[in-house]
Amino acid sequence: MTDRERPEPTTIQPVGRSVSRRTVIKGLAATGGLAATGGILAACSSGATPAPSTGGGETAAPSAGGESPAASAGGSITFGSNYSDDVPKNAMQAVVDAFTAKTGIEVAVNTVDHGSFQDQISSYLQGTPDDTFTWFAGYRMRFFAGQGLATDISDVWSEIGSNYSDAFKAASTGDDGKQYFIPFYNYPWVVIYRKSLFEEKGYSIPATWDDFKALGDRMKADGLVPLAFGDSDGWPAMGTFDILNMRLNGYDFHIGLMAGNEKWTDPKVASVFEKWRELLPYLQEGALGRTWQDAAQAMIGKQAGMYFLGTFAGEQASEADRPDLDFFPFPTLGTEFDSELGIDAPIDGFMVSKAPKNLEGAKEFMRFLATGEAQNIFLESSPNNVAAANDADTSAYTPFQQKMAEIIGGSGAIAQFLDRDTRPDFAGPNGMQGFLQNFINDPEQDLTAYLQTIQDFWDSLV
């Protein structure tokens, strides 16, 4: 991927490439803080659509199988997928195969590199997109639904709604009160580590900021990198901003900032970057030239002691190493907002494009994806998330997954992630991706001028 050609309308030039990954509101109970990113996903034709040249290739459509209880839908559908890494790609293919076997509806899967998918989504949806596509809950969903680029699936929700909590339904609802999204799973952003390393070195789980830094000092003395970090893709640093802002200034301020109701020039925002400076000595150097996957390997390989990322980082571990992974919540910072236990816990799922060639087939696919059956099939191969559907079988959850469910359930303030909680043109490589990379590249720069530049960029968009 290369930088977008649109010039940066600021005095600070972003550092690095354009990509974003990923990715409910307070207590998963409202929709005001649910999210956005975007870019421009090269328009694909319907049918077996080819991936853009920057993408990750195309997955072959599975063959039809068996008699279909939904034979009235019939035919085939197309599915644009951002599950490009091997583990989720194979897990999604297993879901597609099960759907075809159950309904007789064939699915032509167009798999595109995850970051490319995000960056190209706007033009993709405005062109001739696939019938169905992977996407995200919250503002990102509402943004495109509000532009008329997604199909209202409220009729599907009238059938499957009892299989979801009210919070998941709220996260799937557009500004017009209609439903446009099927939640599939979610996952928390946490500090991941290897149990065997902590046992070998006698490390304790840090509860407070001072404990966290003291552990970092100990790890450095032991010849370890305390915190793995890779931000060449532009989005991982957003998680650090989110957690520091929520823990220092509270969930409401954070979501207000994402919505433009608070100012980037507020001294509260400067305090986030000042706190971040305290963390920098413990972070893996050269982050702007490292992918999140390579950073994960540093933690898995025990060159780094910890890694703050979504639990999907576990996809990078071998089956033999996976049981050795554990995590703990980001430490408290000693503020009035510690009790919120605010975290990012993004919801991933699916939508139907504005004018699918096979609307009934697309809706049948949504019905299937809304079942515990489909979600359990996915989680069998990708046990780094927790299912969204009420009827999902959680008895087979690993201790890792059980702990994920507990930490999500115990949080009183759940955000979706920076690039899902704000408008797409502000979150992208010309916006916060680039601005955060600029800070990482030059953390001692004048914060007053830096934050004014971010505010000026926001003001230029609204």
What are these regions (language model features)?
Residues 136-189, 213, 240-242, 326-328, ...:
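Hinge/lid segment of periplasmic solute-binding proteins
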Residues 63, 180-184, 189, 213-261, ...:
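Extracytoplasmic/periplasmic solute-binding protein
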Residues 98-165, 196-207, 298, 305-306, ...:
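Extracytoplasmic "Venus flytrap"/periplasmic binding protein-like
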